[in-house]
């Protein structure tokens, strides 16, 4: 069941435009009829409402161990934009273990905004024996971006959004370091830390010659909302 929290004196709104300069350059503007202002408006609307916690994940998915969750792998052949002749591809993470919050993911293209629907058949569950309902009702926990960093024959993992507002990026001839966060709230306080999370993403479909990828994100939590723009 979902639960609600009373609003604080002010539910704060944060708005960020971030350029991840690991291997791409920042570009301004968009050819699509959706942009940062749209996300900021949604964040304002959320900030004006009482926070509502998402419904709980199925118990069997909550109970997955680290290794069991790792055994649920997205099938590479089901990657978004695979076979479309585009420089980027998207792969997705399954909910479970510590990654229990639902994340909505959309593609922004010339036709508008289209939700990328979760499909359990896009995943290999390995040795896990989940009920069909739990698997299909899971939804996404996050996603990763692939791009040919070193050779045109292979698309490397270059950016990951998974868990709360955590993300990490990888450039050519680099190794992953610590993850970054979109926002940290009440860190190291006796009252306990609050973990805002990215509830929804909008990813612009790239052109066949694109060298950048634009991602918008909406953040939400008990005391804050946020709008973000990432350009790789």
Feature names for model-found ranges:
Residues 15-27:
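Bacterial N-terminal signal peptides
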Residues 30-35:
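Boundary at the C-terminal end of the N-terminal hydrophobic targeting segment
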Residues 41-189:
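Solvent-exposed N-terminal domain segments of exported/luminal and surface proteins
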Residues 25, 103, 213:
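A broad, low-specificity signal marking well-ordered, structured residues that form hydrophobic/aromatic
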Residues 172, 176-231:
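Extended, loop-rich substrate-binding clefts of extracytoplasmic carbohydrate-active enzymes
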Residues 2-17:
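Bacterial N-terminal signal peptides that target proteins for export
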């Amino acid at each position: 069941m979902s639960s609600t929290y009373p609003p604080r004196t002010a539910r704060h709104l944060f708005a960020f435009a971030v350029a991840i300069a690991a291997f791409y350059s920042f570009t301004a503007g968009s050819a699509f009829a959706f942009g940062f202002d749209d996300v900021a408006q949604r964040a304002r609307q959320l900030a004006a409402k009482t926070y509502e916690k998402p419904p709980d994940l199925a118990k069997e998915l909550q109970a997955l161990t680290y290794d069991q969750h790792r055994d649920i792998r997205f099938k590479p052949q089901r990657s978004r934009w695979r076979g479309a002749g585009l420089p980027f591809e998207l792969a997705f993470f399954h909910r479970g273990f510590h990654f229990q919050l639902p994340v909505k993911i959309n593609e922004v293209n010339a036709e508008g905004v289209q939700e990328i629907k979760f499909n359990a058949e896009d995943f290999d569950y390995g040795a896990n024996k989940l009920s069909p309902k739990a698997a299909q009702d899971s939804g996404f926990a996050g996603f990763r971006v692939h791009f040919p960093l070193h050779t045109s024959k292979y698309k490397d993992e270059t950016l990951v959004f998974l868990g709360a507002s955590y993300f990490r990026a990888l450039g050519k001839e680099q190794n992953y370091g610590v993850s970054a966060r979109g926002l940290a709230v009440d860190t190291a306080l006796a009252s306990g830390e609050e973990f805002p999370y990215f509830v929804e993403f909008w990813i612009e479909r790239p052109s066949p010659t694109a060298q950048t990828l634009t991602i918008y994100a909406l953040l939400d939590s008990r005391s804050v909302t946020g709008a973000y723009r990432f350009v790789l």
